[in-house]
């Protein structure tokens, strides 16, 4: 099964969804390859239930969207779907989202674009490039095919294309990698309870040996649906800090089992002790644990943590990074570092262009940045913005356009 499109997008998470829809709206024929049976990535498969990075950091009470276009559109759709607007949490504004609604919204967005073809349950199995463009090999349950494309967007989160083309990538050493998240659904919680009271119960459980130490970082949030809550754990990812490898199948398998085991133990423990939890039970598991950091491409330019903290701006910027450095290098919760004066930083187009590959663009958490900057740009609100940039750039490149047009179209207004 072989055919040709203008743009292939690999991965249908926040960045890939934005890239595919944006490229299609630009008039390109697009094929989106997604390994799950639904789109949304971390926001659906991993049940991450908050859009972070959509809004500017500001002391004033009203939330202000940082990036126009696709990020603003999907925020508006989610507000209508859930009936929940942005919420101030400490110094940041976030938008609660529900994974079920995110799947529905993504379905509607791709169905609205005639030139966009989605292939679910499909994994990339090879790639090559010549003067005329790309050939991407893929497989779906044993059925193999190849798709020719003039340009490609890697929004896989793990820079998967590098396995076949030998592109330049980097990954932070294991002890410093952001620890993975494990989010699960809980039903029949009649009264979630005060967070400090619940934290006290968890401390007691760990001290008594009834719960593992990783339970200490667990947080709960009501989903907005009757009796439903989400629990979020930070996991070590390995028995030893240096043993975590988010690209290793054995490590990933261990991670899934660890998440389910800890979540089950916590809910059982609270059901026997905490008021309002007597009828609570785990209602659903994520399709996969939430990997926060893995392999990144080396691009024409690299965004750094220092750039984020100083609010640095660039001549070729196509989006704004507005989330603080959210460092989760242990399973003990986040360490937040905010930029000077809460200033946004620019995200250069060069970070979305792979060094030495004229027709390859990247978006989401695998774009060109260092470990610290990735702790900011990996959140879904920013992924919508970088996906939009990569999708527009790929569509314009496929049709012979110049990259200056991308910068002109997407230059931030703030």
Q: PLM features: residue spans?
A:
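Beta1/beta-strand and adjacent pyrophosphate-binding region of the FAD-binding site
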Residues: 2-13
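Short, well-ordered alpha-helix to beta-strand connector turns
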Residues: 5, 27, 149-150
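N-terminal Rossmann-fold NAD(P) dinucleotide-binding loop
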Residues: 16
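Conserved N-terminal/central alpha/beta ligand/cofactor-binding core
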Residues: 22, 28-29, 34-126, 179
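Flavin (FAD/FMN)-binding glycine-rich loop and adjacent Rossmann-like elements that form
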Residues: 42, 143-151, 155-414
